[in-house]
Amino acid sequence: MGKDTIADIITSIRNADMNRKGTVRIESTNITESIVKILLREGFIENVRKHRENNQYFLILTLRHRRNKKESYKTILNLKRISRPGLRIYSNSQRIPRILGGIGIVILSTSQGIMTDREARLKRIGGEILCYIW
């Protein structure tokens, strides 16, 4: 059985966010680096560092938390894996879904690389819907 690195990233970030952890350590691959760059650019995470340990590279993500008067921290990150190895979901540029009216983002794997739904609509290309983030 294969390893689903995108689901591992999503699960690690979601668990750290629910447990109010400040940092997450994930394996560094080309796909994970592309997804993390999108998360950083869209403001869902604060910082990314690349760490080397025993000839293996890891990404250390610093999560963004919002303070609330009633609670000490409020989680602001919701992630959902859409396309998975057993069931691939594809969409053309006209049918890419909008998450919460454009507040959330859809991460797509296209022929021109991994990008957000807005970038794919501007370039008028479709692809595999990897995950929703809001």
From Swiss-Prot:
GO molecular function, one term: rRNA binding
The UniProt record lists the keyword RNA-binding: yes
Cell compartment(s), UniProt: Plastid, Chloroplast
Keywords on record: Chloroplast, Plastid, Ribonucleoprotein, Ribosomal protein, RNA-binding, rRNA-binding
UniProt-listed Pfam families: Ribosomal_S8
Coiled coil: none
GO BP: any one term: translation
PROSITE patterns: RIBOSOMAL_S8
Gene Ontology cellular-component terms listed: chloroplast; ribonucleoprotein complex; ribosome
Keyword Hydrolase: no
Quaternary structure and interacting proteins, as annotated: Part of the 30S ribosomal subunit.
Function of the molecule: One of the primary rRNA binding proteins, it binds directly to 16S rRNA central domain where it helps coordinate assembly of the platform of the 30S subunit.
Protein family (similarity comment): Belongs to the universal ribosomal protein uS8 family.
The protein's name in its UniProt record: Small ribosomal subunit protein uS8c
Native organism: Arabis hirsuta (Hairy rock-cress)
